[in-house]
């Protein structure tokens, strides 16, 4: 299992990740990280110096205060009760830097938590409660199916239809997006950790958990009429304007798993009656366009974890680290 423990300064850690780009997945994987990154480049074209996925984004900074009550489940310093600096990035999936903010696709929030001693904790989240693939192969096939037809400049509807028919694990997220319009602002959405993680406490007891961040500004959705009339770029400026009037906050809610809950499949939800507790508050106090801002050069690898939090064997979660490293290495080199 490939897990990064981050007791290194952020600048040095990022440099080491660039060297990790050649990492490949275990032999049993159907596709490699290189193939996925190449597929993203083929479908969305190469934008030098930019992320291959979640290319369009906005930076924000602030702090996180975790609740010591979480120490029942984890020894992580993330929940010390002391303010910790954070860098966040909001983004839209895909490699198109000009994707319209009205697109009915997921919204992402990635956060780097800076813990005492130089260690880091990353969380990469979406505003959908499930992911769109149970395996790297499905994720790869989805990217390939979305490649624009040269004659139309748009994805081939027949290829999209065939993909959905042959990949039922892609349907739960697609159905959620079809039923729920996008939020009018980054601050009006909950963000889900998608994957299941292991919390390890001081006695080395392991608890399976999932988490989500719930906005204090409330969850809202745009109407169909608002989607039709909205400009293609409004999310960034709305966030910048919002934080000028005061900080924005999300409560971190932890869901406690029970025996039998799916641990390795991010397309499956847990039962709604699982125990849930508040374990912290994320506060963002400023925001800026990503060019030259705090989040631009960060690699929000979800396997960057501080002591007390560990990954499960979710194949999608484990696949993300080498894919992120390859993309990050290309960005550092200006490609």
Regions found by a protein language model. Give the residues of each.
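Bacterial N-terminal signal peptides
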Residues: 11-22
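Bacterial N-terminal signal peptides that target proteins for export
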Residues: 2-12
């Amino acid at each position: 299992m490939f897990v990064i423990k981050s007791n290194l300064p952020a600048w040095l850690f990022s440099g080491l990740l660039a060297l990790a780009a050649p990492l490949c997945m275990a032999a049993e994987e159907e596709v490699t990280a290189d193939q996925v990154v190449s597929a993203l480049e083929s479908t969305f074209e190469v934008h030098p110096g930019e992320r291959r996925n979640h290319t369009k984004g906005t930076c924000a900074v602030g702090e996180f205060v975790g609740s010591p009550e979480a120490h029942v489940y984890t020894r992580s310093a993330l929940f010390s009760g002391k303010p910790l600096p954070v860098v966040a990035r909001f983004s839209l999936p895909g490699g198109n830097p000009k994707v319209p903010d009205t697109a009915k696709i997921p919204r992402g929030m990635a956060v780097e938590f800076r813990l005492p001693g130089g260690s880091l904790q990353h969380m990469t989240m979406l505003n959908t409660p499930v992911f769109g693939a149970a395996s790297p192969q499905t994720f790869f096939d989805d990217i390939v199916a979305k490649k624009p037809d040269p004659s139309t400049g748009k994805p081939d509807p027949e290829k999209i239809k065939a993909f959905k028919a042959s990949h039922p694990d892609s349907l739960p997220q697609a159905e959620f997006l079809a039923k729920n319009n996008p939020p009018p602002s980054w601050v009006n959405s909950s963000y889900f950790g998608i994957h299941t993680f292991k919390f390890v406490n001081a006695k080395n007891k392991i608890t399976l958990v999932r988490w989500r961040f719930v906005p204090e500004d409330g969850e809202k959705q745009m109407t169909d009429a608002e989607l039709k009339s909205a400009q293609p770029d409004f999310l960034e400026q709305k966030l910048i304007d919002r934080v000028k009037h005061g900080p924005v906050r999300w409560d971190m809610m932890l869901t406690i798993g029970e025996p039998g809950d799916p641990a390795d499949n991010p397309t499956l939800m847990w039962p709604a009656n699982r125990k849930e507790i508040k374990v912290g508050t994320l506060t963002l106090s400023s925001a800026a366009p990503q060019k030259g801002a705090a989040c631009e050069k960060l690699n929000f690898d979800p396997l960057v974890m501080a002591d007390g939090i560990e990954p499960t064997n979710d194949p999608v979660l484990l696949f993300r680290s080498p894919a992120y490293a390859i993309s990050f290495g290309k960005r550092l080199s200006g490609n």
